[in-house]
Amino acid sequence: MPVEKLHARYVYDSRGNPTVEVDLTTQHGLFRAIVPSGASTGVHEALELRDKDASKWGGKGVLKAVQNVNEIIAPAVIDAKLDVKDQAAFDKFLLELDGTENKSKLGANAILGVSIAAARAGAGEKGVPLYEHIASLASSPQPYVLPVPFLNVLNGGSHAGGRLAIQEFMIAPTEFESFSESLRAGTEVYHELKKLAKKEYGASAGNVGDEGGVAPDIQTAEEALNLITEAIDAAGYTGKIKIAIDAASSEFYNEEANKYDLDFKNPDSDKSLWKTGEELAAYYSELIKKYPIVSFEDPFAEDDWAAWSHFVSTTDIQIVGDDLTVTNPVRIKRAIEEKSANALLLKVNQIGTITESIQAANDSYDAKWGVMVSHRSGETEDVTIADLAVGLRAGQIKTGAPSRSERLAKYNQLLRIEEELGDKAIFAGPKFHLSRAI
């Protein structure tokens, strides 16, 4: 069924910045998508088109991207009478219309909004849920797999104030029978953590960062990890809930010195304490020995390939590429060849279409990698990634703490999907890393 109407507008994300919303109308109704945006963005990501007009929204407006949908994409798509059920052909048309490698002509935020809306319309036309439509597009095996929620309960780095360099400390409730039990345990730990943070660091420590995690004035990773393990113990889930880290280390990498500064938010940081890639790897290895860490994302800067490969060869946990791979097939291929990671962080707005996201996931699965579907720090009420995680059989999702509506929207959607699927789905649990093969 072709598109009858396509219209974009700007709305606001969870950080109060403008983002693109797209409405796509067919005979079956109106289908809507909202595009997220990131705070720590990889230099190799598809281009998020911002207006750069300092007089409006501090230069972060998206009026140009909206205009590109309404004046360029919409008439072309309607004219071409594209079938919304054929996602690959639809997305190919969008890519050819843009014609650049990084989607800089029309903007990845314009293209993605249309791509997601088309996927929703395709599902609507088939009369199936979005996750089922995606599973069909991706040729995912049955049964469906509900993902382990990687809950970002403590924020540092670019997502919070304080001096903590590492960006995210997550809990992963793996040792449970269902997604709903897993999420319940995670929320109980989160509430214990808030109580402990307030007790230890004062009332303001209960305030939350961009992704809903607490952001106490913590200096070191050990301090953060001790607080989290104490919360897990207090909630009664020792051994059942694991820990994951997203270092987002490109944020504290000093290119000139080729070293990592774990005190990068301090203007008087002691340069003698800056670490080489190997020294940082040794530090991480000590943390992995001491705490129940099962996954480590972006341990090194996005182009420090040697440090990544060295770390993967010396550890047996999941090493996730985000800034390293930016959901980009070329960089994923290189990372697979150089054994620089063993899991992909899948962010649809890093690559810009549903089809390319599916391809990135399938390329990763073919290499026996894990795939973790992810939100961005600037999120909205759009729940597409919940359906994507189930449709791709990813087995793991990170979409913030169990706090703030834009984060909970995704977890709540997963609860609905779990209820709807019943015994047609299983929970990934401790097999989250290779859930495609469960």
UniProtKB/Swiss-Prot annotation:
Its cofactor is Mg(2+). InterPro entries: Enolase, Enolase-like_C_sf, Enolase-like_N, Enolase_C, Enolase_CS, Enolase_N. One of its GO terms (cellular component) is phosphopyruvate hydratase complex. Pathway: Carbohydrate degradation; glycolysis; pyruvate from D-glyceraldehyde 3-phosphate: step 4/5. Its main location: cytoplasm. GO terms for biological process: glycolytic process. Substrate binds at H159, E168, E297, D322, S374, H375, R376, S377, K398. It is found in: Cytoplasm. SMART domains: Enolase_C, Enolase_N. Mg(2+) is required for catalysis and for stabilizing the dimer. Keywords: Cytoplasm, Glycolysis, Lyase, Magnesium, Metal-binding. The active site is at E211, K347. It catalyses: (2R)-2-phosphoglycerate = phosphoenolpyruvate + H2O. One of its GO terms (molecular function) is phosphopyruvate hydratase activity. Its EC number is 4.2.1.11. Belongs to the enolase family. Homodimer. This is Enolase. It comes from Yarrowia lipolytica (strain CLIB 122 / E 150).
